[in-house]
Amino acid sequence: ALPIFLNDESSSMDEEVFARYFDPENIAYWLAFQLLTGNTDTQSRNVYLYSPQNSDCWYLLDWDNDGMLRRKEREIIQFSDSESWERGVSNYWGNVLFRRCLQTESFRQLLDTAMDELYAYMNQDRIESMLAHYRSVTEEYVWRMPDRLYVPITHEQYEEVLESIWPEIDEDYDYYWESYHNPMPFYIGTPSLQNGVLQLSWDTSYDFNAEDISYTVELARDYQFRQMVYREEHVVLPLTQTAAPAAGQYFIRVRATNTSGYTQDAFDYYVIDSGKVYGVKCFYIQPDGTVVEDTYEE
């Protein structure tokens, strides 16, 4: 019954889903912790779901935090991850439960409160005190074998990472409030080829302030979009078309912009050695005219 309620957009989150299946306060505080620590790989996994015996209610429990508070480390090793739409509430827009929570005003008020309370709790003095304590326990092992083999940074960079922990929490707190101004991410469809015309389409974006949204569509032969094949701005409908290019590898990028000028990438991303290229889908036009989407499995 739960999947039916969640996927039925006419069902009430307050009167049906929250009243029976989930505790909104539990979800709000769980989300607030993930948002403040930048633990982005929690959209649909790395969470423990618990339902007490003889109960229909499910609770989210924190689990697997190995991706949290790593922004400075990724910057040092020049690896692109947890950026773009993965910052702020847009990170959870692709999950039906979280999306419907975020579309519910009463839940957003709960989440605002949870963010403020946890941000106050995770203050600079507390975090720096905890860092000093845990460092005194763990640091001697970090630089010993075999652990030393797996540390991707130097002693000096280790100091930089430690100094960046609380500022990252502070930054993530700001990202939360800013993310409501942006259009929400969306998926790009697999292009189709018909009668010499390449059809390009994508899902519509969503704006919390109900602002009008337009799209910028780009097609290129490379993921850096230096070899541009097609570009169109101010597209209102979630589709466009262009003359079919020759067989080969192509990249499509779509960005949504609202009336206030805030821009969002698509959910899709292309993976290279240095991480994610956000908002980009790769596909191939075969010699026989069929279109094959490039897929990536983690």
Where are these regions (language model features)?
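Middle-to-C-terminal accessory/interaction subdomains
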Residues: 3-43, 50-212, 279-280, 284-297
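Residue-level signal for short segments within beta-strands and strand-turn junctions
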Residues: 51, 219-223, 256-258
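An aromatic-rich alpha-helical recognition segment common to small helix-rich domains
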Residues: 200-202, 217, 252-254
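Solvent-exposed loop/turn segments flanking beta-strands in beta-repeat/beta-sandwich domains
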Residues: 205-225, 263
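Short beta-strand segments within Ig-like beta-sandwich modules, predominantly Fibronectin type-III
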Residues: 229-236
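Exposed aromatic-hydrophobic patches
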Residues: 237-244
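Beta-strand-rich modules
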Residues: 244-263
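Beta-sandwich strand segments
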Residues: 261-275
